[in-house]
Amino acid sequence: MFLQLFASKKGVGSTKNGRDSNPKYLGVKKGDGSLVTVGQIIVRQRGTKIHPGANVGRGKDDTLYALADGIVKFGRKGANRKQVSVVPIQLAVEA
C-alpha cells in the first residue's frame, strides 16, 4: 500500500523585482554665470563627462569644484569635449 502526500501549502514563486538603488544626486550644481567660492562643487558626475578648466579641481570621484572665487563659465575644449572654468572675480570685473 502506497500513501500519496499532497502539499498542504501552495508553493509561492519569488519575484525578480523589488530592488532599487539610492539616488546619487549627480549633475550640474552651479550653472554658467554663477558666483562660486573656493571649494564649492560645480558638477557631480561619473567619469569626466565635463573636464576641468582654469581654476577648477577634480576630485577622486570626478567631482569638479572651484579652486578660486569667481564666476563659472562652461565652454568647449576641442570638437567634442565640454569644459568648465572659473573666471576669478578680479578678471571678471575688468572684462
UniProtKB/Swiss-Prot annotation:
Any idea which UniProt keywords this protein has? Ribonucleoprotein, Ribosomal protein
User: Which cellular component terms (GO) are annotated to the entry?
Assistant: cytosolic large ribosomal subunit
GO molecular function terms attached to this record: structural constituent of ribosome
Q: Name one GO biological process term.
A: translation
Modified how: The N-terminus is cleaved by ribosomal processing cysteine protease Prp.
List the propeptide region positions.
1-6
A Pfam family hit: Ribosomal_L27
Q: Cite the InterPro entries for this sequence.
A: Ribosomal_bL27, Ribosomal_bL27_CS
Family, similarity comment: Belongs to the bacterial ribosomal protein bL27 family.
Q: What is this protein called?
A: Large ribosomal subunit protein bL27
Q: Which organism is it from?
A: Symbiobacterium thermophilum (strain DSM 24528 / JCM 14929 / IAM 14863 / T)
